[in-house]
Amino acid sequence: MRNLLPALLLLAAASARGAETAAFLDIGVGARGIGMGGAYTALADDSSAVYWNPAGLARAEKREVAVSHAELGAGTREDFLAYAHPISRGTVAAALTYLSQGAISGRDATGRPTGDFQASDAAFAGAYGLKTEYADLGASVKYLRSHIASSEAQGVAADVGARRAFDGAGPGKLVVGAAVRNMGPGLKYDTQRNDLPLRVAGGAAYSFSSGRTLAFEVQTAPRGGGADAGFGGEFKVMEGALLRLGWSTKSAAPAGSGFDAARGLTVGLGLERAGFLFDYAAQAAGELGAAHRFTLGKRF
């Protein structure tokens, strides 16, 4: 039963939004953004912006490669690989997201075991962030592939985003951003086609000269209704070392899960040295315990 929990929770999240599929597209990637409660649409300026907001790629000054691994509980794992390459008027990037749920116990309509089956999802993305005079713009195209037992579905999706920074806004810098994620015709398993988790997100982040950053974000689901909010902070504790704290309504643990006192709480750590970046984040995951994410990157 425990191996079935990740699938049930993903399906429940999709059901709450309506008949959606490919729920893995709404989980989030990278330890920095998750450590800040998912309030990253405005702040994203690294290779993980391929997921959060492709406009955040626009002003990358160096090439970056990053790999991220997440243990989401009960054998469910998420891996993310991205590469960003600055060009004359912006940055191009490519990324792969892969979610594996391992072996899941199958049962028929009467509850009798039918043997284990596998489930996995993948998204291959190409993105471009463009610098303009007034705002940075970005777009990405994704090829999607989903596999559940003997059923398989393929499809395409697209994201668009915008981002603008206001230097000299008081003692620091203000950044605002917005993105529309997972636009597309959905995925078709056998004869039924389900919608992708279309999301519209907008937020703001303020970075102080002291090294502190505060961020806020709201995300809506136009098809199924409902909204989520995220708050996060990043604090410089010494040169090259950052602590992060966040809270998200989307990642809040369900009541009675044993994690009520920490519902929605995320914590993280960031280290940077000689162009290498290491980030870690943890978030409450209800009955699955705590989800852990690790990201290793290199800028050159």
Residue ranges and their predicted role:
Residues 32-58:
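Single transmembrane alpha-helix segments in multi-pass membrane proteins
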Residues 18-37, 41, 62, 70, ...:
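Outer-membrane beta-barrel porins/channels
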